[in-house]
Amino acid sequence: MFDVLMYLFESYIHNETEMRVDQDTLTDDLTRAGFHRNDIYSALSWLEKLADIQEGQTAPLYLASDPLAMRIYTQDEELRLDAECRGFLLFLEQMQVLNLETREMIIERVMALETQEFDLEDLKWVILMVLFNVPGCENAYQQMEELLFEVNDGYVQ
């Protein structure tokens, strides 16, 4: 499923390719590219739920909190997001690339992935996908892109 999301993001979304394709055509294209239908349907469902969150139809579970409060992760979240991933999310919050809402969207979308293995590189792509699709986060997306693609040394690589 994550491979399908990456392919879609790199091939269509990130490259600003016109994406006015119906789901059946897209599914056929992805099948021809070598992806399994179950993974395709899971990825499309994941993207639909991301769109629902952005449109306010569904909200991740979070409450308004003190901006200085520390996020406590559930046991399942800690299993999926190792210390390096959690540290990177905190780093992005401190750099004001992420805010409470976008952080929670990212965590919710990470937890919705059907994968057993998840690392920092995967998290970076999920962050890009979420920020790309959230209205008003264009600057945060651009900052994240710069962190990922233009920095050769240091913590973020």
From Swiss-Prot:
Record-linked InterPro entries: Smg (IPR007456)
Residue ranges the record marks as coiled coil: none
Family: Belongs to the Smg family.
HAMAP family in the cross-refs: Smg
The name this protein goes by in its record: Protein Smg
Organism: Pectobacterium atrosepticum (strain SCRI 1043 / ATCC BAA-672)
Gene name in the database record: smg
